[in-house]
Structure formats: structure tokens, C-alpha cells
Amino acid sequence: MILNRQKRVRVALPPLEKFARRVGRELGLDGRDVSICLVSDAEMARLNKSFRGKQGPTDVLSFPSSEEAASRRASSKSIGDIAIAPMVARRNAKRYGRTLPDELRILILHGVLHLMGYDHERDSGQMERRERLLRRRLDLE
């Protein structure tokens, strides 16, 4: 399920919901739920400060529902929540020469990998390699 809690960027939700289900199938998460919320830059900055101690908005934040979910062992139906800032995504899309829908799909994939326990800041490139492979498989490259 995707909730749009921002008003600055127009986003078509059904294609993103379809993509999120496809990511779940690719990663073996059938029957598991991920909640995705599109938030304003101000809300993302607040979340980024509260949970990471960093100033300003970021593009995506992931909140695993439990430690077990983060380490891929949970039996819970929900693996967690993802917050995405479409304004940041739009700026990044322009910078990287992508469309906004593609950038949002990349952020969904990135967020789900974090929910599964991947951590690009600590895993010696494991998450980056997995994400690159999945981007090719999901026609994002």
C-alpha cells in the first residue's frame, strides 16, 4: 500500500504499487506487506533528524518492523515501512537523467532492500551489488 501525504509532486500510485508487488516477488516476499508513504521535504527532514541525526531531507528512509524482519527471519506479515520524499526524488531524477517514476521505483527497491537487512554503509558492497542486479532484472538500468 502506498499513501501520498504530500501535495507538491503529482505521483501516479497504481504503477508504483504494481512495481512494489513485483519487487516483493523478485525478493521472495510474497504474502508480506510493505507500507510506503510519500512525504513532504519538511516531514522527511524531521524523520531524518529524529532517526538518523542528520539535517535536511533525504530521498528514502526504511523502518523495519522488527530486528527479525531486518535479518530476514521474521514470520510477521509486515516487514516494515518506507518513507519517500518525491521532491528530493524529482531533484535526483533530474541530476541523474532519469524520469521521476523510474527514480521512485529505484527508491522503492532500495527501501525494501534495507527492510530486508541490507546496509550499504556497512556491508562492503553487498547491497550495492544486489541492487544493481535487481535494477537490471526490473528494467531500471
Model-assigned labels for residue ranges:
Residues 106:
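Conserved SAM/SAH cofactor-binding pocket of Class I
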